[in-house]
Amino acid sequence: MIENITDEIYYHINTGQKLQIGDILEIGKRFNNFYYEIYNIEHIEDNKDANQYLIDMKKEKNLLLNNDTLNLVFKTINDSAMITRELMFEEVRKELNPNLPSRLKCLYVCKTKNEIKDWINIFSRTNKKDFQIVKLKLTGNIFTGDASFILRQNISLNRKKKQAKMYWNGEKKDNINEYLFIGTAVVEDILN
């Protein structure tokens, strides 16, 4: 479930502030970039959110969406589902084992370069294009979960909670490994 590691090499896809060789990161005390981004996201266009656009369209019986409005609605639905998922997973983590690394404060890492390629593929679907691949030396605690439990977002809260329990209990479904790290990370190399 949770493993204590010392000076082990892992890789990270960094989408935040650019890192340099020798940087030392203390992970686990504050929100990570992923959670900070989704927690602070707002989708508003012309002082309207997606719900207001949909309400107006229904009132006017005009169900045609222009591309900008469609993108706004899509991003709102997707991000709302993601936030709901993360909050559910955090609630379940606290219930089952609060000593496991929080998805909200951890550093997501990969064990191999092949796993990095798989995650870059997943990232490409979210339009994250500006990133660094960094090689890290890690000392701390690491949890291995199966990310296939988190990839489907628009499911019932009940099903989401069941998936969260399976994830935090270390069950395997499709073996899409996801490593959650808290502790000290030293940047050994920048690979791109």
Regions found by a protein language model. Give the residues of each.
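Extracellular-facing segments of soluble proteins and assemblies that are Gly/Ser/Thr-biased and enriched
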Residues: I83, E90, P98-K111
